[in-house]
Amino acid sequence: MNAIYPGTFDPLTLGHEEIINRAAKLFDNLLVAVAVSSSKLTMFDLQDRLKLVEIISNRYPNVTFTSYKGLTVDCAHTNNIKTILRGARNSTDFNYE
């Protein structure tokens, strides 16, 4: 089974890294998808965020990464992925999703 882990990753945190670590063990393939968000003012530009994600992704043979614009579901569909992975720090995050 394949999964997509989308986010702006601005910045990539230890929490994100832990989710990638766990997901790499659960799924055959994991796509870490770095969102280009025109509505968010980011601390790091897209290229810097991709570099950080690449460093983590390279630790796992079944983890790849990409950037995308638009809807997460469209990115998942384009990559033939049916499972979207999300992290939730607390009930507020869970309710938001």
What positions do the PLM features span?
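Nucleotidyltransferase catalytic core that binds NTPs
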Residues: 1-97
